[in-house]
Amino acid sequence: GCAFQVGEQCFNIGRLVTFLSDLDIRVPGMTVDRWCGSSMEAIHIAAGKIAMGSGKAFICGGVESMTRVKTGFDPLPYPYSDKEKQNPNLYLSMGITAENVAKKYNISRTEQQEFALESHRKANEAQQKEKFVGEITKIDNCETDENIRPNSTMEKLDSLKLAFDQNGTVT
């Protein structure tokens, strides 16, 4: 999965990965672009192919590095069509989607923060018990998920600024 196929993550990176990994040249590769759901969609495609018997094993994952996408990058290399201009909600970021879900289901900022705090607590506990060892491939001495915040508190979460809608709830 890779939504912004630029720089070294362009030109069908899924195929390049199979080639650069010294897999047999007959091993196919493909890149899936479903924006924030690209990696998950790749997994769903592989699961579907296994279920219907068109393969036994697949390598799936996300290869996108947002630091490789230049600020101001326009993912649409062509001018917006009239139909796209008339439908501004066609491409919503995950942040705006989160705001919409929170609004639709009346999920307060406090509820979101409580969920986040518990999520980090559980993730930290699992990491301490080495539950993720088989899930993380060691790269350049990185053996753990550095995004888990074991010292997070409600006070720290309360101090975060709203990120997407100044009248919203998502930080």
Regions picked out by a protein language model, each given a short descriptive name:
Residues 15, 99, 124:
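Short glycine-/small-residue-rich flexible loop motifs, especially phosphate/cofactor-binding loops
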Residues 47, 51-101:
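Flexible glycine-/small-residue-enriched beta->alpha junction loops
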Residues 9-10, 69-71, 144-145, 152:
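Short, well-ordered secondary-structure micro-motifs
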Residues 1-3, 141-142:
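A short beta-alpha structural unit
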Residues 32-63, 102-129:
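Active-site-proximal alpha-helical scaffold in enzymes
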Residues 111-171:
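N-terminal extracellular/periplasmic Venus flytrap/periplasmic-binding protein-like
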Residues 6, 65-67, 123:
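Glycine-rich nucleotide phosphate-binding loop and flanking beta-alpha elements
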Residues 2-55, 89-96, 151-171:
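Conserved catalytic cysteine-centered active-site region
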